[in-house]
Structure formats: C-alpha cells, structure tokens
Amino acid sequence: MEKISPQNATLAELDALFESAMRVELDEYDESDLVLLQVCGAALGGARAKVCVVYQNELYLVKFALPNDDFSVILWEKTLLDLAHLAGIRVPESRLITLKNGQKALMIKRFDRINSARLPFLSARSWLNLQANSAQESSYTSFADSLCETSDKIELFCRMYFNALCANTDDHLKNHALLYDRTNKAWRLSPAYD
C-alpha cells in the first residue's frame, strides 16, 4: 500500500470512518477501509479506534466504541473526564456525539495544537528517556522530580490520587505528558488524557 498523507476528517465523514473501523476490528475489512483509516488516523496510537476531525475550526480526536466492549468504555471515559474536571484536574474539552447509526463516539479537543499548529509534546516516558520494555525504574516520583513547576507536581499528585480512587488500571508514563510553553520557554504538564 502506498504512503498516504494524513488529513483531518469532518463530522459528516464520521459514519463512514466508524464503519471502516468496525470492519477492521472484526477482521472483515478490505484495502479501502485501511486507506480511509490511514488517511484520517494514521499517527494516532492507542488501543481504541480513533480519527482526527475538524469541528468548528478546531481539531478533535474522535474515539469509537468497539464491538467487543463489555461496557460503554466511551461513556465511562467521558464520565471520568468530567469528574477529573470537577476535581480541579486540567482536562481537554470533550463531548459525546451520536452517529447516524445510533452509536456513541467521544470527541476530545486536541490540546497539542493551536490553530492547527503543533505544540512540542513529549510523553513522560520519553521525557525520562525510558525504552518501551525497559527494566529501568520508572514512577510518578521520577517524573515528578523532573518537573520544574510546583503546580505541575501538585497536579500530578492529584491525578495519581484520582486514578487510584477511580481504579484506573491504565495509568502509566505514556498517559502523562509535557507540552512546551513557548511564551515561558518551559516544558509544562499537559492536560490529563486517556
């Protein structure tokens, strides 16, 4: 398959993207499904099917429900984003949408873009220079020690506490990150995600 340049979808294209993503999940896809998903979600990692869309001139990630979900992971993630916000943790703007087929999808505003320009972004694992399956020590403590701003350290602690209270078992150093603040010329803790 030839290399395709990524592009952003629109809300009008979400139903077709959802159908392609489901065919891939169910191993019933053809090359056209792969091409469509590669164009709109090629660089987006993670376990959940997702694409990037433009909504009101802003970029959003859209996460789809998966056919084998035991419960509504999308609704649960939206609930946790809302609870984290109420707890004073910085999270990106998010909203649930309903596709034409009745399926729910979660839209999350991209915090690593300003007017579609990329902001420098590093996961905590990359920041600490850890390899994927490294036996090196990695922890909240080592990440917190590397943060310059006390407010970032406090927020990291609040996230740790929040994740423990919510029984978040997917809490690791790839789910925390830093964004480069060009105004203050410093790396700062990104909003919470995933």
Region annotations inferred by a language model:
Residues 1-193:
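Phosphate/dinucleotide-binding and metal-coordinating scaffold of catalytic cores
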